[in-house]
Amino acid sequence: MKNLLKKSLLGLAFLSLNGFAFADAQAVAELQQRLDKAMQYSADFEQTVRSSKGKEIQKGQGKFQVKRPNLFRMDTQSPQENLIVSDGKTLWFYDPFVSQVTANWVKDAVSNTPFVLLTSNDKSHWDQYDVTQNVDNFVLKPKSKKSAIKQFDIRIDATGLVKGFSTIERDGQSNLYVLRNISTAHLSESLFSFSVPKGAELDDQRGKK
């Protein structure tokens, strides 16, 4: 009797685990399907940064541009200018205030820069996250405990319109991005190329992996 009960419990546990895995795979497929509906778009964004206690620390704004597959550009204009560009292979971060550029391979930056997933269907990228869905809200959590990001949320409707996204860092600080003035007009691929500005210092992490 005890053995039968044990087997039943193990069976239920196995079914439960499979159910969760299926739900996760289903959420990934649904999110990828929605993202595929908008192959390119640009939008203005409003950013709100909050502390782990929910206190507003900073507000900012800028422009976000995506061209699938694998290209995106996030140009923060205030309160301090900076630029993030993915050219498909390298993720560039430029801080003009200190005149420094950091370069990482996209494949090595996914767990800390989940924005990459908005442009990618690469299985190796998506395998780094657990994904759950609640209607138009998708929650992505990195599997790596070394990731600086605790959670990445995407709000996207069934037509493929991304309305916003947010990150929660390990220390509890959150960044909310709300997209406005969304346009699906053609974007030149030249927007997603990057050259190190003259006089800027390059911190090239690509050769350190």
UniProtKB/Swiss-Prot annotation:
Chief place of localization: periplasm
Keyword Plastid: no
GO cellular component labels: outer membrane-bounded periplasmic space
InterPro entries in the record: LolA/LolB/LppX, OM_lipoprot_carrier_LolA-like, OM_lipoprot_carrier_LolA_Pbac
Signal peptide: 1-23
Keywords: Chaperone, Periplasm, Protein transport, Signal, Transport
Subcellular location: Periplasm
GO terms, biological process: lipoprotein localization to outer membrane; lipoprotein transport
Physiological role: Participates in the translocation of lipoproteins from the inner membrane to the outer membrane. Only forms a complex with a lipoprotein if the residue after the N-terminal Cys is not an aspartate (The Asp acts as a targeting signal to indicate that the lipoprotein should stay in the inner membrane).
Annotated NCBIfam families: lolA
HAMAP family per record: LolA
Family membership noted in the UniProt record: Belongs to the LolA family.
Known partners and oligomeric status: Monomer.
PANTHER family the UniProt entry points to: OUTER-MEMBRANE LIPOPROTEIN CARRIER PROTEIN
Protein name: Outer-membrane lipoprotein carrier protein
Natural source organism: Glaesserella parasuis serovar 5 (strain SH0165)
